[in-house]
């Protein structure tokens, strides 16, 4: 019986990782379990750093030491025992990929099945004449080769190995024994009687040289014989290399399988690699499968409205100023161009000569020496600089490849059709449309019985995977969407969909706030999807703050009671029904005892607006919108409705550019912003880390460390010893411990085991040398101060205003629990964002700042949201403007103004469907069809 109990539960004994206080917890298996609690209370530590880490460690330890050296190493978490643990998979908020070749389709493997479908039942069409492609006989091939240019020298090749791994000694020996003398190996001609060594782990291509011949009537029979031999050797394929004098040779592919007789072109047999943009077989030869190319941007090289002698040509005056400036002046003098004029004031001939050159020799002086050089034009000069590996990224733009129009594939691959659609059509349609297409069997009724039999299992896999994406609220995305542009919440839901598609059972899934980025409309969809994953026999542990998700859980674990040192305990575990009867913070917000309400501030007397005009980006078409200033404005709408496109991709970069050059207000990409005179800066506060190394911490980021170092340097003992403030920095020589160089830890490489961080035995983790630690303020050394929580430090430095005022802002944003010297890499995204807010609060404010935040409630408990709301409104009370992209109804209902985008995502979005106060948006929801308004109406009842 005892055994059964253990197997039905995961039992954690003595968990002490980070701030966890010797936790004992029993979690039921095969259920939907939610971990909740304040930000920094220890939820993620228990879920990810303890349960998942131990599950992963046990799996890796079961592998051989040889295999382990190639895998990420996972250390043992600080826990006495975990029983009943199953294999664990973590689905966190990290962006899926930074690789420009990753797309939604490749991540979910849907693209792999599409490639297979196109290779097996695709109909080939000629990309030139659009006629269907048919087979080519041996006599047709012979005729085409014989009609090549008279006296051309050609090599007829039989492809033996195509881009495969192996040493292929047997193949090479077989060719030699059958009388072949030469072969092309990886593009280089070799003699087969010589020793050839091929690396078995690398891909190789081997082509037998069947004959080398000159095109003329006398050699017709010889060509025919060679062609027949090559076709037989290579199962109906051959290559012809046409040699050219003083130019690279030309390759032509011929096949008995596929050809367009009208255009006299042969095509290779279709295979999945023909549709892979990561393979030379399928990738566009111009952009190499990226879909985009970097090229010089005239608008970045040249300012047409600035006089030529005042730096209008940025690329010339940006590098080697003297040389290019002298050459440019020589060109203008020779062509009679007045450099006091702007580019737009020159005539067409002068403009063309300036940009593209006119072949004239220009005389000029450089370093007191007379020089004569041809004027190549600004464009060519810029390209020459690029070849010299000078950084011209400031003058380049990423543009859609003109050859493949951004679709990444060769023309021959893009012309293949399935059910009347090309691959590009499937990649550019919203996933919702792709799902409905594959869910309609009539689209494939044209297939014969054999084709149906081949296509059926492939279509089933595609339909399932596309449905799972649609089901988690991602129907607005496209399969061709670049993975780098996907948010953390979207990438997590993609991986949830992929896991459902994998069909795994008996797995422990650990998820980090899957509701992030989801509108209330889609939350129930997500919960149903998670339920489907759980019903397959899996255990779900979800770190979450969303009310609906918590209420739908089978089992809730609340970590607290507070955060940091005041957290790390299980304050509740049990059913939702039991939770609602509890009297701690989470339960109080769920049962309605406590509510998040806006602080009382006087509304601004002056009413100013920021108006964005002519927005055309992604799914937004010709949009103009007014945003009130000196208010808390929420941008709302379902996922994919255009919120980020409008604010982060349009308003933010445009406003930053214009405010940086505030003398002249002009439009960028057609976008015009009216009302910027009411602002002096735009600040974007995201959830990116405040530092990427352990040397970054809240004290250094907020600037309080500078004041603390000055205070220590002002101590009598420090002055006697001549210590300056730099003595108390762990980043420079002098006061720091040199053994660990101010890290406090030393990393020991363990090869087959995880690297171990060992406390420095010289400074014992203090980061400073003993002489520095002898200097004390109120009996505390600099190391003692860095180990204090913000709350403790505020009390300690209460009589030092310059320090106390900065610490007070950290307290105001609810971060009293973090330590001053806490490693920046251990801070959550929500904590990092609030530290940035605290830094802004501590600055002397002009009251003319526009703050932009993207989902600031990510990772925040109801109590934390309350703190955040107070901070946002306090910044507005100072006369600043606050623009927040948000789905959280507690923030939305307490905003001054709402701009709701929609009505749906993707092509069905991109419009402002409702705007006004929260009450106005709620009252007009039936008229505007605003989903936000409908949920807001329920919330405001």
Language model features with spans:
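Conserved phosphate-binding elements of NTP-dependent enzyme cores
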Residues: 1-941
């Amino acid at each position: 019986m005892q055994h059964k109990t253990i197997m039905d539960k995961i039992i954690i004994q003595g968990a002490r990782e980070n701030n966890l206080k010797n936790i004992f917890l029993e979690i039921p298996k095969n259920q939907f379990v939610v971990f909740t609690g304040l930000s920094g209370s220890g939820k993620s530590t228990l879920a990810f750093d303890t349960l998942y880490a131990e599950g992963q460690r046990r799996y890796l330890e079961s592998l051989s030491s040889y295999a382990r050296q190639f895998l990420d190493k996972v250390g043992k978490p600080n826990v006495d025992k975990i029983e009943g643990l199953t294999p664990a998979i973590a689905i966190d908020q990290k962006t899926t990929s930074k690789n420009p070749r990753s797309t939604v389709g490749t991540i979910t493997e849907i693209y792999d099945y599409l490639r297979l479908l196109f290779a097996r039942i695709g109909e080939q069409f000629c990309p030139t004449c659009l006629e269907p492609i048919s087979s080519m006989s041996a006599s047709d091939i012979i005729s085409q080769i014989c009609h090549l240019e008279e006296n051309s020298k050609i090599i007829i090749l039989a492809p033996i190995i195509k881009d495969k791994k192996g040493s292929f000694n047997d193949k090479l020996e077989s060719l030699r024994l059958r009388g072949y003398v030469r072969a092309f190996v990886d593009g280089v001609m070799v003699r087969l009687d010589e020793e050839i060594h091929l690396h078995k782990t690398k891909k190789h291509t081997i082509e037998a040289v069947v004959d080398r011949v000159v095109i003329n009537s006398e050699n017709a029979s010889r060509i025919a014989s060679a062609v027949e031999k090559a076709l037989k050797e290579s199962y109906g394929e051959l290559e012809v290399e046409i040699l050219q004098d003083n130019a690279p040779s030309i390759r032509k592919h011929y096949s008995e399988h596929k050809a367009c007789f009208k255009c006299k072109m042969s095509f290779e047999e279709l295979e999945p690699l023909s549709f892979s943009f990561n393979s030379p077989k399928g990738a566009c030869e111009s952009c190499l499968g990226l879909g985009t190319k970097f090229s010089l941007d005239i608008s970045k090289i040249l300012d047409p409205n600035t006089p030529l002698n005042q730096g209008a040509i940025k690329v010339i005056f940006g590098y080697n100023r003297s040389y290019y400036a002298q050459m440019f002046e020589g060109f203008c003098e020779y062509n009679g161009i007045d450099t006091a004029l702007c580019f737009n004031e020159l005539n067409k001939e002068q403009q063309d000569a300036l940009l593209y050159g006119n072949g004239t020799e220009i005389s000029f002086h450089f370093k007191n020496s007379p020089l004569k050089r041809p004027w190549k034009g600004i464009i060519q000069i810029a390209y020459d600089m690029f070849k010299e590996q000078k950084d011209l990224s400031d003058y380049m733009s990423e543009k859609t490849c003109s050859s493949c129009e951004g679709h990444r594939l060769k023309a021959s691959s893009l012309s293949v059709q399935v059910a009347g659609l090309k691959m590009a059509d499937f990649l550019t349609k919203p996933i919702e449309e792709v799902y409905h297409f594959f869910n309609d069997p009539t689209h494939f009724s044209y297939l014969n019985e054999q084709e149906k039999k081949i296509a059926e299992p492939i279509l089933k896999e595609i339909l399932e995977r596309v449905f799972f994406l649609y089901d988690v609220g991602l129907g607005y995305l496209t399969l061709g969407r670049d993975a780098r542009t996907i948010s953390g919440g979207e990438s997590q839901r993609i991986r949830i969909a992929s896991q459902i598609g994998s069909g795994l059972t008996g797995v422990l899934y650990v998820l980090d706030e899957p509701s992030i980025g989801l509108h209330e409309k889609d939350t129930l969809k997500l919960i149903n999807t998670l339920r489907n994953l759980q019903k397959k026999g899996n255990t779900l542990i979800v770190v979450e703050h969303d009310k609906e998700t918590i209420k739908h859980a089978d089992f809730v674990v609340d970590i607290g009671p507070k955060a940091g040192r005041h957290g790390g305990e299980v304050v509740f575990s049990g059913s939702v029904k039991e939770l609602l009867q509890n009297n701690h913070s989470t339960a109080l917000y769920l049962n309605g005892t406590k509510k998040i309400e806006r602080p009382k501030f006087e509304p601004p007397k002056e009413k100013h607006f920021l108006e964005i005009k002519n927005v055309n980006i992604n799914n937004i078409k010709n949009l103009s919108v007014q945003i009130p200033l000196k208010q808390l404005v929420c941008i709302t709408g379902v996922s994919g409705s255009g919120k980020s496109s409008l604010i982060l991709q349009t308003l933010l970069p445009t406003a930053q550019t214009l405010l940086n050059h505030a003398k002249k207000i002009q439009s960028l990409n057609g976008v015009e912003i009216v009302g910027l005179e009411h602002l002096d800066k735009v600040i974007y506060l995201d959830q990116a880390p405040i530092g990427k190394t352990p040397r970054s911490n809240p004290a250094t980021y907020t600037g309080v460390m500078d004041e603390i170092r000055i205070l220590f340097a002002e101590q009598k003992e420090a002055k006697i010893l001549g210590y300056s403030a730099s003595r108390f920095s762990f980043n420079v020589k002098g006061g720091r411990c040199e053994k660990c160089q101010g890290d406090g830890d030393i990393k020991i490489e363990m090869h087959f085991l995880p690297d171990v961080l060992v406390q420095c035995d010289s400074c014992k983790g203090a980061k400073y040398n003993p002489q520095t630690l002898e200097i004390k303020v109120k009996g505390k050394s600099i190391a003692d101060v860095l180990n204090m929580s913000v709350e403790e430090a505020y009390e300690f430095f209460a009589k030092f205003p310059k320090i106390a005022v900065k610490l007070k802002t950290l307290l105001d944003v609810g971060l009293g629990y973090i330590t001053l010297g806490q490693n920046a890499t251990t801070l959550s995204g929500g904590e990092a964002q609030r530290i940035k807010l605290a830094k802004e609060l501590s600055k002397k404010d002009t009251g003319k700042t526009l703050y932009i935040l993207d989902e600031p409630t990510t990772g925040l408990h109801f109590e934390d949201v309350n703190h955040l709301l107070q901070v946002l409104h306090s910044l507005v009370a100072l006369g600043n403007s606050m623009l927040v992209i948000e789905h959280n109804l507690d923030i939305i209902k307490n905003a001054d103004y709402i701009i709701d985008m929609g009505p749906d995502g993707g092509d069905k979005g991109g419009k402002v469907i409702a705007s006004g106060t929260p009450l106005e948006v709620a009252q007009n929801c039936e008229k505007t069809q605003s989903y936000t308004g409908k949920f807001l109406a329920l919330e405001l009842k």
